[in-house]
Amino acid sequence: MKPVRIGIFAIIAFAVLSHGAVEPWARGILEASAGLLLLLWAVRFFFAKKEYQIVFPSLLFPLTALGLLSTAQLAFRFTASAFTTRIELQVMLSMLILVFLAAQAFRTLSDWRGFAWFVMIFAFLVAGFGILQHLTFNGKLYWFRELKYGGIPFGPYANRNHFAGFIELVLPMSLVPLLLGRVRRERLAIVGMLAIIPLSALLLSASRGGIISLAAELAFLALVMILRRTAGRHLVAGGVVLLLAFLTVAWLGVNQILSRFSGLQTLEVTQDKRASMRHGTWRIFLDHPLLGTGLGTLQQVYPPYETLYDGKIVNHTHNDYLEALATTGILGGLCCAWFIATLFTS
């Protein structure tokens, strides 16, 4: 299944480098790639000389349930915008395919080690690019793509908070083994470097939410280390990584970062606007409690619930849980709760 693993790596890399695959052309390539990769797996499975057992990961079931709910919204016209729900459903189907293929392609410890190394190296490269672009920024993504809708970019993302979210997802791949003492002595330096650069990039992005989430991650890891009684010399390794990351940020210009951290708040959604969006989204849920307004339809249904108009389009609530309830109802909320519970227990 090596070609399938390579295909998954390529899709992950493309999704990140294409600004999160949020534009129609990028979504189309991602969806087509997932479909072709599924076809490749099916052909190899059918003509395989040895018998392969198909694995259904536990996370697949709540995702499938949510997909079926969205299909029902579309089929029975329980959606405010059939076009939008269909688009989001196509993306969800692509994610289901990738989750299924990952379960088939990554089975052995060697497979997962390869995945971990890919994530660490890719995160290092993306973070390094983000730092370089930050230091030489000319107002364009990749130095040539204009920002159509404004924003505060970092790395390949048009929104620095999205970059911080990406780093939050991949940083544990290098940081956790260091803190838990799962890295061989001869690899400590390279794994440490693979953690320092993404960590430095996260701090440089000046994403308040990202830095707060990082603090929460570190607190959780500290608790795990205490419970497992693995603190001590392993804590020193983690401390060195954090210290070097802070020194890197200081060397690159801490004053610039602090001013950016405080001065760009006016370019983001204000706290009053966030509170207004949460309130409006909650009212949408109360008016459509069972099935919601349709997957991905918040932008279409939100205007009548607007209480703090500022001339800008609200396409997301900045609260995923509330938005899920508003667009998929109680049934969708139960699917999300099922997914989270499975994630923590599997």
What are these regions (language model features)?
Residues 126, 139-177, 206-209, 319-324:
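Membrane-interface segments at transmembrane-helix junctions in multi-pass inner-membrane proteins
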Residues 1-121, 176-193, 219-243, 269, ...:
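Transmembrane signal-anchor hairpin modules in multi-pass inner-membrane enzymes, especially those
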Residues 330-346:
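Hydrophobic transmembrane alpha-helices and their immediate junctions
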Residues 12-15, 194-206:
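Membrane-interface alpha helices of multi-pass inner-membrane proteins
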Residues 26, 109, 128-137, 144, ...:
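A membrane-periplasm/extracellular boundary helix in multi-pass inner-membrane enzymes
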Residues 21, 77-93, 149-164, 270, ...:
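Short aromatic-rich membrane-water interface segments that cap or initiate transmembrane helices
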Residues 67-74, 111-146, 158, 199-205:
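Hydrophobic alpha-helical transmembrane segments
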Residues 159, 275-314, 321-335:
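TM-adjacent membrane-interface loops and short helices in multi-pass inner/ER membrane proteins
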